[in-house]
Amino acid sequence: MKTKNFPLNKIAFACTLLLANPVAWAEDQFDASLWGGGSVLGIDFARFNVKNAVLPGRYEAQIYVNNEEKGESDIIFADNPATGRAELCFTPKLQEMLDLMDEAIVKSPNSEDDTCVFASDAIPKGTFDYQGGDMKLKLEIPQALTIRRPRGYIAPSRWQTGTNAAFANYDINYYRSGNPEVKSESLYVGLRGGVNFGNWALRHNGSFSRFENQSSSGFTDKGKNHYERGDTYLQRDFALLRGNVTVGDFFSTARIGENFGLRGLRIASDDRMLAPSQRGFAPVVRGVANTNAKVSIKQNGYTIYQITVPAGPFVINDLYASGYSGDLTVEIQESDGKVRSFIVPFSNLAPLMRVGHLRYQLAGGRYRIDSRTFDERVLQGVLQYGLTNHLTLNSSLLYTRHYRAGLFGFGLNTPIGAFSADATWSHAEFPLKKVSKNGYSLHGSYSINFNEIGTNLTLAAYRYSSRDFYTLSDTIGLNRTFRQFSGAYLPEIYRPKNQFQVSLSQSLGNWGNLYLSGQTYNYWEKRGTNTQYQVAYSNSFHILNYSVNLSQSIDKETGKRDNSIYLSLSLPLGDNHSADSSYSRSGNDINQRLGVNGSFGERHQWSYGINASRNNQGYRSYDGNLSHNNSIGSYRASYSRDSLKNRSTSLGVSGAVVAHKYGITLSQPVGESFAIIHAKDAAGAKVESGANVSLDYFGNAVVPYTSPYEINYIGINPSDAEANVEFEATERQIIPRANSISLVDFRTGKNTMVLFNLTLPNGEPVPMASTAQDSEGAFVGDVVQGGVLFANKLTQPKGELIVKWGERESEQCRFHYQVDLDNAQIQNHDIQCKTAE
């Protein structure tokens, strides 16, 4: 193999690219004489006489059915002898994504056979349109042949497990303070990490702390180094359960009843596995259309849903959960123009579920408090069910050897507001005291939203617990106390008796916002009632923002009454900078503060704050802080001093270390699910995540948060990568499972200019318009006039390439190559391409 390096004339190079374009537009006839006429071997140029012609091969495309996006997938085109051109293959993966009725498909693909089943034969009633320039594949088919799914539905088979990897989140904070009399130091390290292997995720969290105090007299108090274990569990999800299974140390996650720590097993539903339009509460809308009609659903004057339905009964059950309350107005516009409407009551303020939806949890194991595990074995079951548009039922059972509790309740949606109520019965046993207690607790709440007068929200909640009502934590704690202090009397633990809360927020338009709240509560073991009130008002005057907060708390047992007032002002000082001031008074104490804060940097990666304060007793303090965020974490520092000669300094850093198949990557702290990006040779390219992340020296980066069971778009902005790095694509789709670590590979090339002058064993040049693929089936270039393969998508310095001008073995050849991908000059190689014997 000969190798030559030479500069290529730019005009000739551009002409080569144009001639290599395989697509002919509109109905233009392809003139084969421009390519040498009959001297070209085996190429049927008639394939390019159709619009958007495409060569055989594998392509990436966004899939659409009747203009509804279904997701991203690889698609395959193969030569169809019946039509003389490459046509779309109907693969099992494509069949799954299209989500069509069985009667729409007359010929199904065979997952065990690579034979191409052409989509035009498999779905004769559909019309496919592949738009190569936009990388889109569109199918138009009668709506009756599609399976109606909730909006945003993603088949569980498309959920991605992710890659095997390990990570550790860390949060380190060092604090030092002192004055002439005493000095102290403390160190805190918070950890949360895990390992993913297959469908399982192992997670652990804990913290390490130490401190040291030293007085001016020389006395030193060194605290013990202490590591506190939190949760340690193994978890995976199951589509069949619409939930997950957790084994180990964890906290129960019931939305009703009591939550606590366990060492054991939990099976619980996960609402995130539902389509986005099925999460939260929204009513099912039912109606009847007399003709082919347009149905519009409005809330608070805005159209939130619209669909065309055929004549007859219709059901709409995929409304997105709204963040606002307000009845739904359903308008039916018939084909003759007549419009009729009806109202569906709706409030999102009660614990409501959609009709037919179920939320559950079953947990059992040994009781845990902090990092301690006790002998008491606990079993808990929780069930919530949406019975109708207006009624949701809630229930919970809790069982241990010395404690039982049962809860039953409901959420009710009505035109005059949302109600919820529940009753809990408890039976607590204290064996060492030979005493058992039976009690109950009643809870009720009411909420309503008056949108007509400016989004006025009222919320009231009341709970009453009888004298003999004990929670699980009360019972276990008391029994442990009795065992530790034999013969001790029944200690006081301050169990709630009455609790009442009310709050109201009111938008006043241009006059600002008003918020009122109040609560009162008392205990069986204490006399008197504690009461708290709060009034808050906020508004702006031109660019000045201001707020006032008044509060009062009353303890009738001690007769203590605390009144406080807080006033704050904030004034913008240009982009991302502001000055703020506050005044507060509590009793006889008055404090004033003045500060400046903001952010700066190309991506606002730096932030700062400077404050000065004083009180009415002559005390003054000054403090400042600075923080920085980048791809590998966040860093913070602060300093303060006051008029009493107290000084303090703190330093902090938080981030994550992620180990994966491409190495070890430093990152910002990661969430439950996150993604690893790998793009070879693309160091410096920015990640389009809004998280101030760039690819490191090795072409790796971490997107710290992804949304499970949803389509996530992971993108790269290549502008800061080396100029000769070429991306096959700059955006990918992933659909991660909960707790998954996704690996997103972006194929890149150094855009090395390599020309292979290919000849066949008989001395003829390889046919023009042939395509070349690497051993993995990836496209690397086209053959132009004279058998020249322009290969600008090589990803490996050596390997084997396959050149095709048809699907038969006699219409293919292969050759091995070795090039220098770091060479910026054009490389030219003379090679004989070997055909099958």
UniProtKB/Swiss-Prot annotation:
Swiss-Prot/TrEMBL keywords: Cell outer membrane, Disulfide bond, Fimbrium biogenesis, Membrane, Signal, Transmembrane, Transmembrane beta strand, Transport
Pfam family, one: PapC_N
Record localization: Cell outer membrane
Membrane topology: Multi-pass membrane protein
BP-aspect Gene Ontology terms: pilus assembly
InterPro entries: Fimb_usher (IPR000015), Fimbrial_membr_usher_CS (IPR018030), FimD_plug_dom (IPR042186), PapC-like_C (IPR025949), PapC-like_C_sf (IPR043142), PapC_N (IPR025885), PapC_N_sf (IPR037224)
One GO cellular component term: cell outer membrane
Signal sequence range: 1-26
Intrachain S-S bonds: C813-C833
GO molecular function list: fimbrial usher porin activity
Family, similarity comment: Belongs to the fimbrial export usher family.
Primary role: Essential for piliation.
Protein name (database record): Outer membrane usher protein HifC
Taxonomic lineage: Bacteria, Pseudomonadati, Pseudomonadota, Gammaproteobacteria, Pasteurellales
Gene: hifC
